């Protein structure tokens, strides 16, 4: 049990110190992510490699995104990862030995929450690619450069969130595994051996209750502080996720406004072309009529010249 609590404390301290540490480069993080090599981690590694290939947005990726092949591949990789993860979690649950019911329930709840977040990240990624395919189909031969830029930004953010939640799940499974290992190693003899020192410690604490009354309060305060730090970290992560979602929504609104402005410019150009098509024939017809009228007047004047006698002459 002490080993389990030690792992819990180390995990919480690592989470509290994470804000002050410099962010690792993506390549380094990738190498650290799946180092234990559990089956579910291997499956997630395949999903991760496929995602990195999709993120290149090469010509082949663009071609396959036009169909449902990419989303189908991601669905298969997602199902493989979740299946292996559930099997690994069930294996750990079977290995859990004598443990306080409250501790067991809390650990199971934390692992389930981390597992759900990872599954939601994968689902969001698949839905975003499906949305991109639909948007490309509605462009009707127009340029999709802006769509690709938006997709690249979203994939980068989703990939970062997926990595963070996967690492969080790894940490919680490590705590869960520590409890299972301790339960598997614990037997009746070990329990009896531990009960003796615990009873003796209880007697000593009872005898020294007056002198050491402040120690339990200090332990409780430290435990409460650890829980508060964990809660603050969780709230901070949720706030960052919400901020990223709001930024994505603002980018989508800006893109839609620019798209509508482009459509209005195109419609104005079309209307201008139509007006030009309507008035140019009228102007040309008026010019022809005016030219014909001038020619007729000139011809009439040439055919009927003014006689000289009609011009008055000066007397000598």
Swiss-Prot record:
Annotated spans, 8 X 22 AA approximate tandem repeats: 76-251
Region (LDL and other lipoprotein receptors binding): 154-164
Region spans: Specificity for association with VLDL: 274-286
Keywords: Chylomicron, Endosome, Extracellular matrix, Glycoprotein, HDL, Heparin-binding, Lipid transport, Lipid-binding, Oxidation, Phosphoprotein, Repeat, Secreted, Signal, Transport, VLDL
UniProt keyword Transcription present: no
GO cellular component terms attached to this protein's record: chylomicron; extracellular exosome; high-density lipoprotein particle; low-density lipoprotein particle; multivesicular body, internal vesicle; very-low-density lipoprotein particle
Protein location: Secreted; Secreted, Extracellular space; Secreted, Extracellular space, Extracellular matrix; Extracellular vesicle
Alphabetical list of InterPro entries matching this protein: ApoA_E (IPR000074), Apolipoprotein_A1/A4/E (IPR050163)
Binding sites annotated in the UniProt record for heparin: 158-161, 225-232
Source organism, top-level taxon: Eukaryota
Repeat positions for Sequence: 76-97, 98-119, 120-141, 142-163, 164-185, 186-207, 208-229, 230-251
Residues modified as Methionine sulfoxide: 139
Region Homooligomerization, annotated ranges: 262-316
Modification Phosphoserine occurs at: 143
Signal peptide: 1-18
MF GO annotations: cholesterol transfer activity; heparin binding; phosphatidylcholine-sterol O-acyltransferase activator activity; phospholipid binding
Similarity comment: family membership: Belongs to the apolipoprotein A1/A4/E family.
PANTHER family registered for this protein in UniProt: APOLIPOPROTEIN, APOLIPOPROTEIN E
Function: APOE is an apolipoprotein, a protein associating with lipid particles, that mainly functions in lipoprotein-mediated lipid transport between organs via the plasma and interstitial fluids. APOE is a core component of plasma lipoproteins and is involved in their production, conversion and clearance. Apolipoproteins are amphipathic molecules that interact both with lipids of the lipoprotein particle core and the aqueous environment of the plasma.
Record-given protein name: Apolipoprotein E
Species per Swiss-Prot/TrEMBL record: Peromyscus leucopus (White-footed mouse)
């Amino acid at each position: 049990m002490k080993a389990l609590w030690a792992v819990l404390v180390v995990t919480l301290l690592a989470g509290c110190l994470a804000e002050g540490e410099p962010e690792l480069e993506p390549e380094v993080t990738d190498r650290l992510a799946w180092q234990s090599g559990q089956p579910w981690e291997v499956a997630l590694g395949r999903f991760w490699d496929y995602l990195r290939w999709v993120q290149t947005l090469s010509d082949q990726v663009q071609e396959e995104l036009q169909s449902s092949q990419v989303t189908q591949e991601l669905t298969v990789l997602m199902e493989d990862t979740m299946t292996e993860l559930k099997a690994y979690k069930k294996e750990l649950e079977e290995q859990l030995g004598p443990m306080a019911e409250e501790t067991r329930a809390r650990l199971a709840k934390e692992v389930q929450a981390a597992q759900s977040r990872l599954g939601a990240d994968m689902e969001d990624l698949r839905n975003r690619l499906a949305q991109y395919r639909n948007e490309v189909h509605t462009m009707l031969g127009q340029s999709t450069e802006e769509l690709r830029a938006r997709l690249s930004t979203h994939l980068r953010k989703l990939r970062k969130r997926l990595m963070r939640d996967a690492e969080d799940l790894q940490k919680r499974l490590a705590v869960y595994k520590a409890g299972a290992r301790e339960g598997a190693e614990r037997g009746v003899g070990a329990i009896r051996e531990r009960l003796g020192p615990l009873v003796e410690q209880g007697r000593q604490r009872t005898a020294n209750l007056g002198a050491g009354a402040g120690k339990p309060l200090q332990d409780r305060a430290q435990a409460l502080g650890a829980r508060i730090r964990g809660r603050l970290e969780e709230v901070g992560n949720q706030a960052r996720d919400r901020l990223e979602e709001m930024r994505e929504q603002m980018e989508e609104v800006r893109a839609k406004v620019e798209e509508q402005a482009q459509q209005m410019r195109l419609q104005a150009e079309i209307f201008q072309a139509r007006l030009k098509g309507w008035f140019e024939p009228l102007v040309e017809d008026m010019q022809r009529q005016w030219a014909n009228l001038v020619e007729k007047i000139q011809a009439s004047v040439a055919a009927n010249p003014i006689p000289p006698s009609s011009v008055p002459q000066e007397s000598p």
